[in-house]
């Protein structure tokens, strides 16, 4: 992950990418979140990811209140980003774009949080390849010539079980009154490798085995270049030895949220030669139970034939005593004509009612259906949200080129406020005080299509999850709220 900032009132592009800075400046963008992902994150197997992203392309942005035409700025933004990252974002138009009312709240400071300034779209069919990776790496201060970015070889990355590239841009206040603010750009890549299959049943791994090479140099422009290895389970579910020895060991947190981290200062280690961080396990792979997430959602299409069908969202609240208030956002393509009167919300034999319903019907070839529900999920129970639809007749030119894929449907987005942080996720470094200066708010996202939890120093977090059905429902998600 790389993070660098640009003062809002100063055109300083020594580290901040000039091309991206010009795009957000010309289009009056206050906040931007973009991800390009290949594969699906298996949350029940891998826990919660550090940076959530659904398959395909996923984009949402907040615009300044003085923007003359948000719709025009959004179109110009998607076209510019399409050229910037060699992606098909130019296919983002009114038929896949919505302005959510209660979802996707700004993560940073914005002058106005009016939902009319927000635009959200997803292209679950978008494929990711080296044409996207190369321009993404060029946005880094040292490109792929030095530092951690030298590990990003396309051959190794695209053979991973999961690969995601992300750009997150937001405005950060430097004082309480926000007189001084900066633009913060966070670039992250998320990868999942199956080391057990690659190493004949052993979990043993190293940088050279995963990425094809070690690290020879650090980026001279970076103020800090560090590798963190979570060793919390070392000795409990399997014993392994790290080599070389870490620069520092940190233990923080309490109870179920206690974490142990091995910290490697890249600048220190590369001065002594090439760094090939490795973990050598004593025994073959050991399987253990993964705790259930506090909220879990699955989503699928039901019915048969080519005329009618339905979409079912099954939301599981695993809290044994507390009900949870959530916001469910669902964007349905215009070619699926939704019958709102068929909407059913149930938990076991009980029929539930939504606290708030916001629905904008779609128009053929003009806009999608936009449904937002505020729900109270009973404790230790599964809540089912289902509705029916009718497929529209399409022109022969409107069918996708590959009939084997069929039509993709963007995933639902589930938002909730949790009282406590969750133990079962991959991205927990908020418990380590020495890391808070590096990342003050930690993201850990989870879901059948994606779930987000934001953890501040206090035990509060925003939990967001999206789910989807491959071949019937594509996978996309995302919303963040800032914790005080």
Which role fits each region the language model picked out?
Residues 300-301, 315-316, 372-377:
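Beta-strand-rich interaction surfaces with strong enrichment in secreted/lumenal proteins
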Residues 322-328, 338-342, 400:
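Short, hydrophobic/aromatic beta-strand segments
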Residues 350-390:
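Extracellular adhesion/glycan-binding regions together with long Ser/Thr-
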Residues 392-472, 483-484:
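Acidic, serine/threonine- and proline-rich intrinsically disordered appendage/tail regions
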Residues 1-292:
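Extended, low-complexity intrinsically disordered regions enriched in serine/proline/glycine/threonine
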Residues 333-342, 351-353:
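Short aromatic-acidic-glycine turn motif
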Residues 303-332:
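Short beta-strand elements of extracellular/lumenal beta-sandwich folds
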Residues 277-281, 299-302, 328, 383-393:
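Short, hydrophobic/aromatic-enriched beta-strand segments in well-ordered soluble domains
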């Amino acid at each position: 992950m790389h993070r660098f900032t640009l003062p809002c009132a100063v055109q300083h592009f020594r580290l901040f990418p000039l091309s991206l800075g010009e795009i957000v400046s010309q289009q009056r963008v206050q906040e931007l979140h973009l991800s390009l992902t290949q594969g699906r994150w298996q949350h029940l197997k891998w826990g919660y990811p550090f940076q959530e992203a659904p398959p395909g392309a996923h984009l949402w942005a907040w615009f300044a209140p003085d923007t003359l035409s948000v719709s025009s700025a959004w179109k110009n933004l998607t076209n510019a980003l399409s050229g910037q990252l060699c992606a098909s974002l130019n296919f983002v138009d009114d038929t896949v774009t919505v302005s959510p009312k209660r979802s996707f709240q700004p993560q940073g400071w914005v002058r106005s949080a009016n939902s009319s300034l927000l635009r959200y779209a997803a292209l679950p069919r978008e494929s990711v390849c080296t044409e996207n990776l190369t321009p993404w790496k060029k946005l880094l201060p040292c490109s792929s010539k030095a530092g951690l970015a030298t590990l990003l070889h396309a051959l190794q990355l695209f053979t991973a079980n999961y690969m995601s590239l992300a750009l997150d841009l937001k405005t950060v206040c430097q004082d309480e009154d926000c007189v001084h603010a900066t633009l913060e750009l966070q670039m992250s890549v998320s990868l999942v490798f199956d080391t057990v299959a690659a190493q004949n049943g052993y979990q043993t791994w190293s940088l050279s085995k995963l990425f094809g090479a070690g690290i020879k140099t650090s980026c001279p422009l970076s103020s800090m270049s560090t590798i963190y290895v979570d060793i919390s389970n070392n000795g409990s579910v399997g014993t392994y030895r790290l080599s070389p020895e870490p620069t520092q060991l940190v233990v923080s947190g309490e109870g179920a949220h206690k974490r142990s981290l091995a910290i490697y200062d890249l600048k220190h280690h590369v001065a002594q030669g090439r760094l090939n961080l490795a973990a050598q396990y004593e025994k073959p792979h050991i399987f253990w139970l993964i705790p259930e997430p506090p909220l879990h959602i699955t989503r699928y299409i039901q019915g048969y034939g080519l005329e009618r069908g339905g979409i079912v969202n099954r939301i599981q609240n695993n809290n044994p005593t507390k009900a949870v208030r959530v916001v469910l956002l669902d964007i349905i393509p215009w070619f699926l004509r939704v019958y709102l009167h068929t909407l059913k919300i149930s938990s076991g034999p009980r029929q539930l009612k939504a606290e708030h319903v916001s629905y904008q019907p779609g128009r053929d070839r003009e806009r999608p259906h936009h449904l937002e529900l505020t729900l109270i999920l009973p404790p230790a129970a599964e809540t089912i949200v289902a509705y029916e639809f009718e497929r529209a007749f399409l022109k022969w030119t409107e069918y996708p080129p590959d009939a084997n894929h069929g039509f993709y449907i963007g995933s639902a987005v589930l938002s909730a406020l949790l009282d406590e942080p969750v133990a079962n996720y991959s991205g927990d470094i908020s418990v380590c005080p020495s890391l808070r200066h590096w990342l003050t708010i930690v993201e850990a996202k989870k879901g059948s299509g994606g779930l987000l939890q934001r953890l501040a120093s206090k035990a509060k977090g925003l939990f967001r999850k999206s789910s989807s059905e491959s071949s019937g429902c594509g996978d996309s998600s995302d919303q963040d709220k800032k914790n005080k």
